[in-house]
Amino acid sequence: MAILKLRNVAYQAGQKQILQNVSFEVEEGAFLTLIGPSGAGKSTILKLIANLINPTSGKIFFREKDIMKIDPLIYRRSVSYCFQQPSLFGEKVADNLSFPYEVRKQAVDRKRLLQLLHEVSLEADYLDKDVTSLS
């Protein structure tokens, strides 16, 4: 059974047509490689699948459900996107660990942040360290 289906997906940025009538299926457990020249739309397809951008037309299904109708928090437990260029969400370690709380408009749980540091063998003072000082 296909875990992912794209049906006639198109994407347009301004006046530029990036993708047109893209359709394919990925079976559960399968690997998929997207190959093409720079600007061919590979990253755009991945951003569409991750629901970071919306298709101009067409549908994307995950486990037989239209991804536009799945709660984004639930969808992101199964599907994510790793950017080609790493992105950080502030200057301090605490800024980056707090980001998920901010996205969900929740109060930052400092106790949980300290627990996360402990799980990776880092001391509490790392919360205030500049991210560029870490390797």
Regions found by a protein language model. Name each.
Residues 58-66, 75:
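Conserved ABC transporter NBD signature motif
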Residues 32-33, 81:
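Short beta-strand immediately N-terminal to the Walker A/P-loop
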